[in-house]
A protein has these predicted regions:
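S-adenosyl-L-methionine
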Residues: 1-46, 50, 56-63, 87
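Conserved proline-anchored active-site loop of SAM-dependent methyltransferases
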Residues: 33, 47-61, 70-74, 214-231
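Glycine-rich phosphate-binding loop signature in dinucleotide/nucleotide-binding domains
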Residues: 40-43, 145, 211-215
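Class I S-adenosyl-L-methionine-dependent methyltransferase module
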Residues: 67-69, 73-192, 225, 229-271
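General small-molecule cofactor/ligand-binding pocket signal
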Residues: 69, 199-201
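A short helix-to-beta-strand connector/capping loop
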Residues: 191-199
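Conserved SAM/SAH-binding loop
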Residues: 202-207
């Protein structure tokens, strides 16, 4: 499919932070949350979002606070923080050219790959899954060849996550067993932030809080039994790109990054 070709980043249609689907997303509650915080507290120093998720609350805090600490155990969330809030300079023209290249891919000429073999015809339409796998491998190859710096790498991976989010044939963490509607990939870049005061972590929240300081701590842990690392296993797989062996109907890798906040240990974990 040849779609949405642009000459520059400024005039390109871009993904906004809130464009991604995510369980527990606070997009509709953010204004209310920040109003309460501002009415009950003073100062504009350091804001800590210890379970950042999509980082929608952290982004809102950036309008007031000089420093915002973001933390999440998921690789697919951490890479989005580096993409949106990283401070390393990046070449927008280079990424626009790559986005255009990805939008003109002919899936018929792309070989089967790890992504299409595992997720094609299940989570994603077969031809789309070949494109996704090709793009992911191309991003990795360019990074290893030093054609991308770490910020450009993060922006491309995050843009890929946002691009495929609405194409997924899923209900929760598994796929819907019915024919998949064919839709174009339509690769778009994200709208990066100009905020320079972000500090980004990927650590166990209970350990991290012992080593950081701030004025406001916003604590919004997982609150259901579904592990986020299992719910978003495709994105975790896509970002890490270790190409693990997958198991079960939902095609998940071996468990990792399991949160005690999603278990009967939640109460004791909070006390800690």
């Amino acid at each position: 499919y040849g779609l949405n070709l642009f000459n520059d980043y400024k005039n390109q249609d871009k993904f906004q932070l809130q464009s991604r689907r995510y369980i527990g997303n606070k997009a509709k509650l953010t204004d209310w949350i920040m109003e309460i915080i501002e009415s009950e507290t003073e100062g504009n120093g350091t804001f800590i979002d210890i379970f950042s998720g999509t980082s929608i609350v952290a982004k809102s805090a950036m309008e007031k606070y000089k420093t915002v600490i973001l933390n999440d155990i998921l690789y697919s969330n951490n890479i989005t923080y580096q993409a949106f809030y990283g401070t390393l300079k990046w070449n927008s023209n280079k990424l626009v050219e790559l986005a255009n290249e990805y939008n003109t891919l002919n899936s018929k000429s792309i070989r089967e790959n790890y992504f299409s073999k595992n997720f094609g015809g299940k989570f994603y339409e077969k031809e789309i899954s070949k494109q996704i796998g090709y793009i992911r491998q191309d991003i990795e190859k360019k990074k290893k060849n030093n054609e991308l710096n770490s910020r450009e790498y993060a922006i491309l991976l995050t843009s890929l996550i946002y691009t495929i989010d609405r194409l997924a044939n899923t209900v929760g963490h598994a796929y819907i067993k019915k024919p998949i509607t064919k839709r174009p990939l339509n690769f778009k870049l994200i709208q990066t932030s100009d905020f320079k005061g972000a500090k980004i972590y990927q650590e166990d929240a209970n350990e991290l809080v012992r080593n950081i300081k701030g004025d406001i701590a916003y604590i919004d842990p997982p609150y259901n039994s579904r592990q986020y690392s299992r719910f978003y296993h495709i994105y975790e797989n896509l970002v890490q790109w270790k190409k693990p062996k997958l198991f079960g109907v939902a095609l998940k890798p071996e468990p990792e990054n399991m949160s005690k906040y999603c278990t009967v240990q939640a109460k004791d974990t909070f006390k800690d």
